[in-house]
């Protein structure tokens, strides 16, 4: 079992479990390792190498110190394992604080920290899409309420937290950590030879990512979206490179749905390759929550791309405020119209305005300072330890 070095520094346990958490936390993890006695624990929620391992390599991250192997036979068992194994880990290593990001099931690990009176710091706090059907929306509410210090990306998110009655004095706006990660990797992104390897011509393909539970697991939504994708292939008559998660691939296979021949299913791509493809796509069509942040960043560095989000809601309204992407829904008419508009706006020199909270490149430093500042405050004011 891994343990802290006990070198006199604050002992911080960071818990991750999915690709988005690893990507967004990359700069924060490395910064925390500089200034804290830090352990990185992985729940195993995403266990495929291309969904996980390749990103540690791309982002120059040391491997996790602890693998919990929490995946069970079904969702209930997995969620139970995440909570139970995280609790046991905290009992054994005795961290001074726990840091999580986002809204995944892995974030539910903080339930154990709360019962153990360990200060909890939550990044990406306050995000709300106002769609109660989404499991992430439930997780957001749970983790925001449990956390002792919430670190939001934007004033929209801070306002949502305040509206739920959470203490304003323990809520901060740090901005999104994505710009720092993208900036640190921009040279490698621009140098990627992924187009040569895949035989794609820049500007002559559509990049597709569709993996969200509401789009893949719900029959009506699945058929609506993938029929729309086939129509998109017919209309634009160019390759559609589908960065396809194992779950999505299995769903397509099990359903017997026949994709248009121009839709190329590809295993999930590495961080540098995927972002190079985004920068040079005719259009990016994705249900990823990171799309608005990536679109904003690449606009800020002079590489705007047409971005279409295949969802009916967004937890990043600040990106719509600045016109960084188009929200299309999952029907054929909405998707085709949205691609037309997104592509035409970029062609006409109207890429939108970078979101100020999405282009801040010192988020990791802010997080270090907030954690160091508030562990003692939480112990005194919340848990009355001294």
What is each stretch, according to the model?
Residues 1-238, 248-386:
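Nucleotide-activated sugar donor-binding and catalytic core shared by glycosyltransferases
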